[in-house]
Amino acid sequence: MNLEILAQLTALAFIVVSGPLVIALLAFRKGNL
């Protein structure tokens, strides 16, 4: 497998996972306030 493709897939997966995670974290912190 090409290393460049693997890096792009890793970055894409990181964005897909971190997006909802950041939103959930913000909602959780707002709920606590």
UniProtKB/Swiss-Prot annotation:
<feature type="transmembrane region" description="Helical">
    <location>
        <begin position="5"/>
        <end position="25"/>
    </location>
</feature>
<dbReference type="GO" id="GO:0009523">
    <property type="term" value="C:photosystem II"/>
</dbReference>
<dbReference type="Pfam" id="PF05969">
    <property type="entry name" value="PSII_Ycf12"/>
</dbReference>
<protein>
    <recommendedName>
        <fullName>Photosystem II reaction center protein Psb30</fullName>
    </recommendedName>
</protein>
<dbReference type="GO" id="GO:0009535">
    <property type="term" value="C:chloroplast thylakoid membrane"/>
</dbReference>
<dbReference type="InterPro" id="IPR010284">
    <property type="entry name" value="PSII_Ycf12_core-subunit"/>
</dbReference>
<dbReference type="GO" id="GO:0015979">
    <property type="term" value="P:photosynthesis"/>
</dbReference>
<keyword id="KW-0793">Thylakoid</keyword>
<comment type="subunit">
    <text>PSII is composed of 1 copy each of membrane proteins PsbA, PsbB, PsbC, PsbD, PsbE, PsbF, PsbH, PsbI, PsbJ, PsbK, PsbL, PsbM, PsbT, PsbX, PsbY, PsbZ, Psb30/Ycf12, peripheral proteins of the oxygen-evolving complex and a large number of cofactors. It forms dimeric complexes.</text>
</comment>
<keyword id="KW-0812">Transmembrane</keyword>
<comment type="function">
    <text>A core subunit of photosystem II (PSII), probably helps stabilize the reaction center.</text>
</comment>
<keyword id="KW-0472">Membrane</keyword>
<keyword id="KW-0934">Plastid</keyword>
<keyword id="KW-0602">Photosynthesis</keyword>
<keyword id="KW-0604">Photosystem II</keyword>
<keyword id="KW-1133">Transmembrane helix</keyword>
<comment type="similarity">
    <text>Belongs to the Psb30/Ycf12 family.</text>
</comment>
<keyword id="KW-0150">Chloroplast</keyword>
